[in-house]
């Protein structure tokens, strides 16, 4: 995959998830299989997550070279942390199996795309 395609994909996914989580946190939560009605704090947490993803998208979109590579590394670290959080929550019974798979696979997919883009930046 050419590097600019990977960057564009990451910017698009992060923007969509970030804006979606901020603007419609309950809908976004349900799309990921979360029990939004059972957790009245979920919209607040979704908006925190949404702001982070939107900031990561902006950082990638607005930089080049070494600065862009740094944003990619930050995003990869966040994605790996998100994947681990999904696994831990699933193992502890804090997430249903379906939600565990969705949140973990989404985070791992974003991390893989970030790694591919980072390799392209360093080539």
For the regions a language model picked out, list residue spans one by one.
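Short amphipathic, positively biased membrane-proximal segments
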Residues: 1-123
